[in-house]
UniProtKB/Swiss-Prot annotation:
Protein name: Iron-sulfur cluster assembly protein SufD
Summary of the function given for this chain in its UniProt record: Participates in the sulfur mobilization (SUF) pathway for iron-sulfur (Fe-S) cluster biogenesis. As part of a complex consisting of SufB-SufC(2)-SufD, involved in assembly of [4Fe-4S] clusters. Enhances the ATPase activity of SufC.
Biased composition annotated in UniProt, kind: Low complexity: 477-487
Keyword Metal-binding: yes
UniProt entry tagged with the keyword Plastid: yes
Entry's Gene Ontology molecular function annotations: 4 iron, 4 sulfur cluster binding; metal ion binding
Biased composition, class Polar residues, residue ranges: 782-794, 1022-1037
GO annotation (BP), single: iron-sulfur cluster assembly
Region (Disordered): 477-498, 723-743, 765-794, 835-865, 992-1055
Gene this chain is encoded by: SufD
Family assignment from sequence similarity: Belongs to the iron-sulfur cluster assembly SufBD family.
Natural source organism: Plasmodium berghei (strain Anka)
């Protein structure tokens, strides 16, 4: 082989190598400057130089042509392709390698050219240096016309092209071009009009690309569609198009490579911890508007120290961001004037998808080091912490939009991962709305974090060590206190003065504490060391004690100082556990070292408030007054780490996660909207009076008058009129009792008002009392417009009504002792029960001795313990050790999680449940994956994690309270209820977008095209403040210093250069999450009635109520449990009711569901031998409500009986779901199980789903039935009523009342019944027009 051919082939081989091309690029084409390179990798570095070279060459040619005034020939060394960046070189030198690439159909296109003799071959190549010239011409035409040709010869003969150019510029061709072809681009060179006008494929000169795969350009982003994964199929639809092709090349190159399984720590190590300093900030900022302990002046300083991103860098990159503006009023407790404060902070805005695209299940590889993250999903690093690395499955293309613990609003992977790391999990409530219920919103954020489980376990261990240390201190102090009773007073004082720490179990909210005062009624700082020094100096100067009276006074003052000091230490401990939230991540080592030291020595957060004897704040460092009940939140007994010493901290390790076969959540059609809610902790801090709860408290008809009430109800059902008034009220118009009622009306009002002012110190409007009284009418009418007899009948009914024996009010998950009834009622009842017990046992001779002996029992450490027969109140007020142990054991019960570890409850995954599983009795599951009806384990875990308090009702054995009702009211408030926050500037979120770009997912509620300027916002806010000042007489505007406005000045300077559009997203919308919990423990042979109510005082309230009720019955006990739900129309309600029924016990459950946007009640009953359980439910739906109820009755033992009935009235476009599951195990012989659901659809838009199931294993059962019906109102009864002269509207109302009365028979509360009837009246009024249309059609 000759050397020339060898050199040529070696040259081709070297050029095919990327490394050689890179070296070739480095030497800037000095030796091979005539090569035409078409390589994406090389274009990234050479593109700028090519553009400059081509522009210079074109300018030179244009200048020459302008000077000569002659049409120049096209440059012989440049060809332009269809894209601006594809510019290629051709050299004038001969004997070099040249590349020419024409599109398909070249022969046909050149035949149409006006060239003499059709000499198109000369256009392609003029000369050839090969031996057989004729053969090469034939091969060129026959074989290589549709391929990329690589030839070695002379350059193209441009003489023919110039002749063509001159001919094209003629008049005839210009007319031909204008009529048939497109216009020529002005920027393109003249000779390119040949390709443009005749539709030729422009030359795409690809260098040494003959052996590679062909490239097909689809006209769009070529690499995205080819290389994006399935979960990024919506990339082009929901993202802006990239301008430069280089960016798409980078993206496609990253997407081709699979993402490695590395944790956050690995990522941060690779990036040298640059981004780690601004990561994982707690939700402290988002809760500033509702924080009780934050000083107003330090807000701006906190924002500066915890900025999530640099605004300068963010705006240089033209990225969108959010502005959170808060403005609230607070009353200064010293001068009694109203002050204003407004602040804002900035949060980066990430681009998210609108639809759920997580179609593939996420799994964790076995070799993954971190237990807090998932494969190929960097977003899960921040959202799924706190739970184990179990396989989290989704439902598929459609079902995953319903229930998925991953990210339905999925953030783009790889590209924005650096920005994603900068976001704290607390801000996921603004970006990743589907995982709000997994986030810890209160003190347990230390446990559910974005780090590994090692640090979490370390913190829990430190909690345990701290508790042991405090217990030792407590026992040591208690022993000293007992020894001091036998020591002289001087020795007592010396020992007390040497103590540096206090008791841990002192009750925090004893408001009757005495504190030292000065003559001017100003309190001294009991924690300052000067008070101790001065006190000791006085003792040393006096020497001996003059008299016993002075000694007692000094001892009392010193005891008060020590008690207050102990309380301050307790507060300081709680603040170390809950307040220093910003020291967990970026300063984790300092946080750990803090626990290694003696925590009692640090006194940074001791000074909080100073109180008077009534518990009112007279001086506060934070200058924000808080109601007395909310002062208990950070008390030592309210710290959650005390609860987590048992199984509570293990509840997060192996919680079962529902998989794609879960059937219960399929019917929950509106959960996708739930994922997009912005939940927070913005509860209301306003004062709530007892008068506001009068319409929600129980009104029970006495047993002697039940028959009269029953007859009156029957009479009202028949004699109804269209306007909703009862005929029975017209018969008593001349009743003389009404005159007496009118005469005594004013006196009753004054007496009631004075009593409330004396007892509760709360003023209210008399008109509100009248409105509350008027709501006893069944039809919801106003008695003021009625006649005299109507007022008298209402007055009579009032006299017959009685209230609940005791009402316990729980406000936002915390027991409110002010709104609850007086605790002396329970103490009196407890004493009566003890006396009755003593009399029954024959030990009632000396009641004083027995009372003292039982109420005061000395423990092993010398502390006093008390026993109780009944307890109703907060879990943290329990003093009986037996009660605390029993309640504490049930406090950590989580449905599904606790049952998961039962015997024979492992999931069965070998096939369909039924055929194969019955071959293996030991492996038969109870709560298996495939038929798990609830899927509420994570909601229950969140309830335990975010618990602040727990309502407890304990009843000792052999106590019959079946004639008494205990009413427990759970109130969920919202920041929207506050009167001082009803302006538009209280809580506003703005989205700032660069003017040259648009956000892909912009949800504009109130769009504005104005350019954002913060100065204008401050001016408008100042105007609003001035307007508020005019309305409030004693209002003082508190303007901040220049230091507090430094962040605003920085952003103003930035926004002068970069213009952003401001779009308002939310305005004064607060959606708080509350987690109420109720524990009932009824011992053997006891009976009780419980009414549990969940209410909202404002019907417009939203948010989420995540409740859990645990009920435990011992043998031969009986419980009647009534549950009512009357939340706001925008609230989300999730409630787990878990019941353990004892041997031969009877549990009756009645639930009435009226309010909320979406409600979900899960009832799980575990029975015992001979137990009986009953369930009666009623739901009334209107609008777009979605109410669902899931019930599980588990028969594990013999002779169990279950009766279930659920009814629902569905109106408008509401949706009702009912799912029942009854399971009878092999040993549960002689069982009785009956379930039935009846749903009535009132119009065409309503819908309902009913799924009853029975799982029966034994053959020896007495009875098992299940059924469900979904229908409209029956027409025949309505027609029979209409034939008797009753209007259609009233006839439908009578039918609906008859439908619900079967459930209301089990409800003794008249207020609740009236609300059901009022809603039925609304249903009947909606069909007034439809009935007339039907009559018109019949008449025609």
């Amino acid at each position: 082989m000759p050397n020339i051919t060898l050199l040529k082939r070696m040259l081709v081989f070297l050029l095919l190598n990327n490394y050689f091309i890179n070296h070739f690029n480095c030497v800037k084409c000095k030796n091979l400057n005539t090569l035409c390179i078409h390589n994406t990798n090389l274009r990234k570095t050479v593109e700028v130089k090519r553009k400059e070279a081509t522009k210079n060459q074109i300018k030179k040619e244009v200048n020459k042509s302008d000077k000569l005034n002659v049409q120049c020939s096209p440059p012989q060394n440049i060809y332009l392709s269809d894209r601006s960046e594809d510019k290629y070189y051709l050299n004038k030198n001969k004997n070099e390698i040249h590349i020419i690439h024409f599109g398909n159909g070249l022969h046909e296109k050149y035949e149409n050219l006006p060239i003499e003799n059709n000499n198109y071959n000369e256009i392609i190549i003029s000369k050839y240096n090969t031996k057989n010239k004729e053969n090469t011409e034939k091969d060129l035409y026959t074989k290589h016309i549709n391929k990329r040709c690589y030839l070695n010869g002379n350059p193209i003969n441009f003489k023919i092209l110039t002749s063509l150019y001159k001919w094209i510029n003629s008049k005839k061709l210009h007319k031909h071009i204008k009529s048939k072809s497109a216009k020529v681009d002005k920027q393109s060179p003249p000779y390119m009009s040949i390709y443009i006008n005749y539709g030729f494929t422009k030359p795409k000169l690809l260098f040494i690309n003959y052996l590679s795969t062909k490239y097909k350009n689809n006209g769009k982003n070529k690499y995205l569609k080819k290389y994006l994964r399935k979960y990024e199929e919506l990339y082009e639809k929901y993202t802006y198009e990239l301008d430069e092709q280089n960016d798409t090349d980078v993206i496609s190159q990253n997407n081709r490579e699979p993402m490695p399984n590395y944790s956050i720590d690995d990522f941060l190590i690779q990036n040298k911890n640059k981004n780690y300093k601004v990561t994982l900030v707690y939700d402290y900022i988002s809760n500033l508007h509702n924080n009780e302990y934050q000083n107003v002046e330090s807000v701006n300083n906190f924002i500066k120290n915890n900025e999530l991103f640099d605004i300068n860098e963010w705006k240089k990159n033209n990225k969108p961001y959010l502005i959170y503006k808060y403005k609230y009023k607070y009353k200064n407790p010293i001068n009694k004037q109203i002050h204003f404060y407004e602040y804002d902070y900035y949060v980066p805005k990430l681009i998210t998808y609108e639809e759920d695209i997580s179609t593939e299940p996420k799994f964790v590889s076995p070799n993954l080091n971190s237990t807090k993250c998932y494969n190929n999903s960097p977003i899960n690093f921040l959202t799924t912490s706190g739970f184990s690395s179990r396989n989290i499955d989704t439902f598929g293309k459609e079902r995953n939009k319903i229930y998925s613990f991953n990210t339905p609003t999925d953030v783009k992977r790889n590209i924005y991962f650096n920005d994603l790391i900068k976001i704290s999990s607390s801000y996921n409530q603004h970006f990743f709305h589907n995982l709000n219920f997994l986030l810890n919103l209160y003190t347990l954020q230390i446990l559910i974090r974005d780090k590994t489980a090692i640090e979490t376990d370390y913190i829990i261990d430190k909690f345990d060590q701290l508790k042991d240390k405090l217990i030792q201190l407590n026992t040591h102090n208690s022993l000293k206190h007992n020894n001091n009773n036998t020591k002289p007073s001087s020795q007592k004082y010396e020992e007390r003065s040497s103590q540096d720490s206090g008791s841990f179990i002192n009750s925090y909210y004893k408001t009757d504490q005495a504190t030292p005062q000065n003559a001017d009624y100003h309190y001294e700082d009991v924690n300052s060391p000067q008070t101790f020094v001065n006190f000791e100096d006085n003792i040393k100067l006096n020497g001996k004690i003059s008299s016993d009276e002075n000694l007692k006074k000094k001892e009392n003052t010193k005891n008060e100082i020590n008690d207050n000091y102990d309380n301050e230490l307790d507060r300081e401990i709680s603040r170390h556990l809950t307040h220093k939230k910003n020291l967990f991540d970026d300063k984790i080592q300092i946080f750990k070292n803090k626990y290694n030291e003696n925590i009692l020595e640090d006194t940074d957060f001791i000074k909080l408030w100073k109180y008077d004897q009534n518990g009112e704040i007279i001086e506060a460092l934070n200058q924000v007054p808080v109601p007395k009940i909310y002062l208990n939140i950070d008390a030592p007994k309210y710290c959650l780490w005390k609860i987590l010493q048992n199984s509570g901290k293990n509840a997060y390790s192996e919680i079962p996660t529902p998989n794609r076969k879960l059937e219960a959540w399929r019917q929950q059609v509106n959960l996708k909207f739930f994922y997009k809610q912005n939940f927070d902790t913005s509860i209301s801090l306003r004062n709530i009076s007892k008068e506001e709860l009068s319409n929600f408290k129980m009104k029970i008809v006495e047993s002697t008058n039940q028959n009269e009430k029953h007859h009156s109800d029957q009479y009202t059902q028949i004699n109804c009129q269209e306007h909703g008034k009862d005929n029975t009220q017209h018969d008593d118009k001349n009743n003389p009792n009404f005159r007496n009622y009118l005469n005594d009306k004013k006196t009753h009002k004054k007496n009631a008002e004075s009593n409330i002012l004396q007892t509760d110190k709360i003023t209210y409007n008399v008109s509100t009392d009248e409105k509350r009284e008027t709501q006893y009418d069944v039809k919801g009418n106003n008695p003021d417009t009625e006649t005299n007899n109507e007022q008298s009948t209402v007055n009579k009914l009032k006299e017959k009504h009685k209230k609940a024996f005791y009402t316990l009010v729980v406000r936002d998950g915390i027991i409110d002792e002010i709104l609850s009834d007086d605790i002396s009622i329970l103490k009196k009842l407890n004493q009566e029960l003890k006396e009755k017990n003593e009399s029954n046992e024959g030990k009632g001779n000396d009641l004083d001795a027995t009372e003292q002996r039982e109420n005061e029992q000395v423990g092993p450490n010398g502390e006093k313990k008390t026993t109780s027969k009944i307890f109703v109140g907060s879990f943290f007020n329990i003093k009986d050790p037996e009660v605390e142990y029993l309640i504490n054991k049930e406090l950590y019960f989580i449905p599904e999680h606790t049952n998961w570890y039962k015997k024979n409850t492992q999931p069965f995954v070998r096939g369909q449940i039924g055929k194969q599983s019955r071959k293996f009795d030991n492996d038969y599951p109870i709560y298996d994956y495939r038929k798990s009806d609830f899927g509420m384990a994570k909601f229950s875990a969140l309830n335990l994690a975010s618990i602040k308090d727990c309502a407890v009702l304990y009843l000792d054995k052999d106590i019959d309270l079946s004639d008494k009702f205990f009413h427990i009211i759970f109130i969920s408030t919202s920041k929207n209820e506050d009167e001082n926050l009803q302006n538009d500037q209280s809580y506003v979120v703005y989205e700032n977008i660069p003017t040259d770009k648009q956000s892909p997912n912009l949800e504009k509620k109130q769009p504005s095209d104005e350019i954002y300027n913060e100065d204008e916002d401050h001016e408008t806010s100042d105007n609003l403040l001035q307007n508020d000042q005019a309305t409030n007489s004693n209002v003082e505007i508190n303007h901040q210093d220049d230091k507090g406005n430094e962040p605003n000045s920085i952003t103003n300077n930035i926004q002068k250069n970069n213009n952003y559009k401001k779009n308002e997203i939310t305005n004064s919308i607060h959606n708080p999450i509350t987690n109420p919990r109720l524990v009932l423990y009824i011992k053997e042979n006891s009976k009780i009635n419980i009414h549990e109510s969940h209410i909202s005082l404002n019907n417009n309230n939203g948010g989420m109520v995540n409740a859990l009720s645990r009920i435990y019955l011992e043998q031969n006990s009986k419980v009647n449990h009534i549950l009512s739900q009357e939340l706001g129309k925008s609230a989300w309600y999730f409630h787990n009711v878990s019941v353990q029924n004892g041997i031969n016990s009877n549990y009756k459950f009645v639930d009435i569901l009226l309010g909320s946007l979406s409600s979900r009640v899960n009832l799980q009953i575990e029975g015992s031998q001979g137990s009986k359980q009953q369930s009666y439910g009623l739901s009334l739906l209107e609008g777009k409500q979605n109410i669902s109820q899931y019930e599980m009755f588990h028969h594990e033992h013999s002779s169990m009986q279950t009766d279930q009935l659920f009814k629902s009235l569905v109106s408008d476009t509401a949706h009702s779901v009912w799912r029942s599951r009854g399971r009878i195990e092999r040993n549960a012989i002689k069982a009785k199980l009956n379930t039935l659901c009846r749903s009535v659809l009132l119009n065409l838009g309503a819908s309902a789903v009913a799924i009853p199931t029975l799982e029966i294993i034994p053959s020896d059962i007495e009875e098992a039935n299940h059924g469900a019906t979904i229908s409209d109102l029956e027409e025949e009864p309505i027609f029979s009523l209409m034939s008797r002269g009753i209007d259609t509207n009233i006839a439908r109302r009578i039918m609906m009342k008859a439908f619900v009365n079967e459930i209301l028979e089990h409800v003794p509360d008249e207020n609740l019944k009236n609300k059901v009837y009022q809603k039925i009246f609304k249903f009947s009024q909606k069909y007034k027009d439809e009935s007339k249309k039907i009559l018109r059609m019949t008449n025609l």
